[in-house]
């Protein structure tokens, strides 16, 4: 088979000009082919959709505008269908329809590769699905790091999600793992320079759990609130590191308790994120030059 010579020439020129990789993080397909998506969305912005009930206070349909990329976590994909998605817990905790949606690019820890999904019976009970994560469309796998270092968070070759209960992180915090840490690390790896936070309430109560229906026992609510306090300390410590790498995180969650990042109104964030692709579209003249207008007929001689 003859290959296209212009494609070959462009490939050779690109390989010759390629700069050394600055981010050693690798992703893996279900067949464990190694890929890098470093800088894939270079310089763009994304909305990180967490699960706080304040999600119900904003018009999420605005996120369907051209130019806007969203990343969901956990079951926030039941509230808004994201472009990207990630998790750190067992895959069976997350709604199977999201897993089966080929239009959502999913980033998943490698240990979840062979784990089963779950489905819900009509009576609300759960059972194992016939499908495993590796059989789902649009899935990439990543390796996690078990140590959080606020001075190296964006530069390692794996994805930090917190520490185990026996070892302290760079701030002296033990445990306190979170999918939010993973999402921010992945978004930076993908090249996003600005991340807008939604559903980042950083407080949970018996009457304010999630943006979707779900039960939470009192001890789980206490655990989450303790986690939020530790994450707030980590994010305060990360601010100089983020500034050094020109990575902006902006909180657009109404009533959020997280004060580590600057706040912005949701509508203003949508306007900024969609501006580049928000101009009116004309389809004329892209395939062929527009025909010149016919000259105006001359006035009849008198």
Predicted regions and their residues:
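Metal-ion/cofactor- or nucleotide/acyl-coenzyme-handling active-site neighborhoods
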Residues: 1-302
């Amino acid at each position: 088979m003859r290959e296209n010579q212009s494609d070959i020439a462009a490939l050779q020129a690109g390989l010759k000009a390629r700069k050394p990789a600055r981010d050693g993080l690798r992703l893996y397909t279900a067949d464990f082919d190694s890929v890098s998506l470093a800088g894939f969305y270079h310089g763009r912005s994304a909305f990180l959709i967490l699960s706080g009930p304040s999600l119900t206070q904003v018009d999420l349909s605005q996120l369907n505008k051209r130019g806007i990329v969203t990343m969901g976590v956990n079951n926030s994909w039941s509230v808004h269908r994201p472009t990207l998605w990630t998790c750190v817990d067992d895959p069976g905790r997350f709604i199977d329809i999201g897993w089966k949606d080929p239009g959502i690019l999913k980033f998943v820890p490698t240990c979840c590769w062979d784990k089963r999904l779950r489905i819900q019976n009509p009576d609300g009970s759960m059972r194992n699905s016939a499908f495993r994560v590796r059989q789902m469309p649009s899935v990439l796998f990543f390796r996690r790091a078990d140590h959080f270092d606020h001075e190296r968070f964006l530069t390692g070759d794996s994805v930090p999600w917190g520490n185990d209960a026996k070892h302290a992180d760079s701030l002296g915090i033990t445990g306190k793992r979170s999918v939010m840490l993973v999402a921010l690390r992945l978004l930076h790896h993908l090249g996003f320079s600005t991340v807008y936070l939604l559903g980042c309430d950083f407080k949970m109560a018996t009457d304010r759990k999630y943006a979707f229906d779900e039960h939470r026992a009192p001890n789980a609510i206490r655990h989450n609130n303790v986690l939020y306090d530790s994450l707030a300390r980590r994010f305060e410590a990360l601010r100089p590191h983020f500034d050094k790498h020109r990575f902006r995180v902006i909180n657009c969650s109404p009533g959020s308790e997280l004060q580590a990042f600057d706040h912005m109104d949701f509508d203003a964030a949508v306007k900024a994120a969609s501006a580049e692709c928000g101009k009116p579209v004309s389809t004329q003249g892209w395939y062929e030059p527009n025909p010149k207008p016919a000259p105006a007929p001359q006035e009849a001689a008198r």
